Swiss-Prot record:
Gene: ruvB
Protein name, as recorded: Holliday junction branch migration complex subunit RuvB
Segments for region (Small ATPAse domain (RuvB-S)): 180-250
Organism: Rickettsia canadensis (strain McKiel)
Superkingdom assignment: Bacteria
Amino acids binding DNA: 289, 308, 313
Transmembrane parts of this sequence: none
Region Head domain (RuvB-H), residue ranges: 253-342
């Protein structure tokens, strides 16, 4: 699923010029920043590596940026890879043996590591040792390699998919939450200065409230609205040009787009608001289940338009009102069955 409001990183997202390098430049996630600063200062004062750290939460909130910031704050090398890129234990061994003391190794999508790779990672995280099997069959032997102390930073949007042994080895687990409008405005104002965009307060407010609580989306929308401003010979991005551009991009006043409307209308029109299973929804919309669960559903749940229940997905009365559709003749409890994940 690819669209302007996807929180997933796109090849067109040019974030490096505006990505903050230190904690004082990073906007939002205040408690995480304060705690990280304490942990980093303590580790530096002891001349030790920072404990292994896990950043988890919805995509687009700054997990990769924070990982890079940690290495900058400590003053060490930053090595980056991803779960899908580490196909076998030898790939991980090659990365680990090239680390230096206190370096930061960042593994994005760490929940996608396969079991054989995880088994190599456990002793590396706990004992800073690497067990390598040399040879095959009866002649095979195990060789132990000592590793420098390093910090592993993992990032995941699917905490529940991490195995318990791996999750338990992270001494610093941190959940990143959606941003509020004021925080998004600060992100936009900082980016506008770095990108030389004349962004007004009203323009910043308009973009922020339609950005689904996600900085990556806010920055993407800012760039696209700048394009509309340039073509229309506007020198300033104000509320008027922001509203015009966002409407052209089919982003409504609360940050929903055509994919969200398809999702909500399917449940409303075909299942009287639900409950309906996620596999049924995915098949009907020709989308992958993971795409729905990671891209569409988190924000709909966040703003109170959707509930995940043991019996399936249920859209709320507020969703019917937003769709301007009549509310089915159900009791109020049927719209609030349970608040557990399916």
């Amino acid at each position: 699923m690819t669209n302007i409001l996807s929180p997933e990183k796109s090849e067109n997202d040019q974030e490096l010029p505006i990505r903050p390098s230190y904690l004082q430049e990073f906007v939002g996630q205040q408690q995480i920043k304060e705690n990280l600063l304490v942990f980093i200062k303590a580790a530096k004062s002891r001349n030790e590596h920072l404990d292994h750290t896990l950043f988890y939460g919805p995509p687009g909130l700054g997990k990769t940026t924070l990982a890079k910031i940690v290495s900058n704050e400590i003053g060490v090398n930053f090595k980056s890879t991803s779960g899908p890129a580490i196909l076998k234990a030898a790939d991980l061994a090659a990365i680990l043996t090239n680390l230096e003391k206190n370096d930061v190794l960042f593994i994005d999508e760490i929940h996608r590591l396969n079991t054989s790779v995880e088994e190599v990672l456990y002793p590396a995280m706990e004992d800073f040792e690497l067990d390598i099997i040399i040879g095959e069959g009866p002649a095979a032997r195990s060789v132990k390699i000592n590793l420098p102390h390093f910090t592993l930073i993992g990032a995941t949007t699917r905490l529940g998919l991490l195995s318990n042994p791996l999750r338990d080895r992270f001494g610093i687990p941190m959940r990143l939450n959606f941003y509020n409008n004021d925080e998004l405005k600060k992100v936009l104002n900082r980016a506008s200065k770095l990108l030389d965009i004349d962004l007004t307060e009203s323009g910043s407010e308009e973009i922020a409230k339609r950005s689904r609580g996600t900085p990556r989306i806010a920055l993407r929308l800012l760039r696209r609205i700048r394009d509309f401003a340039v073509v229309d010979s506007k020198s300033v991005v104000d509320k008027e040009i922001a509203d015009f551009g966002l409407n052209r991009l089919e982003v409504d006043h609360i940050g929903l787009d055509s994919n969200d409307y398809r999702y909500l209308k399917f449940i409303a029109a075909n299942y009287n608001g639900g409950p309906v299973g996620i596999e049924t929804i995915a098949a009907a919309l020709s989308e992958q289940r993971d795409a729905l669960e990671e891209t569409i559903e988190p924000y709909l749940i966040q703003i109170g338009l959707l509930q995940r229940t043991p019996r399936g997905r249920v859209i709320t009365i507020a969703a019917f009102e937003h769709l301007k559709m009549p509310v089915p003749n159900k009791s109020h409890n049927q719209f609030n069955i349970f608040n557990d994940n399916e």
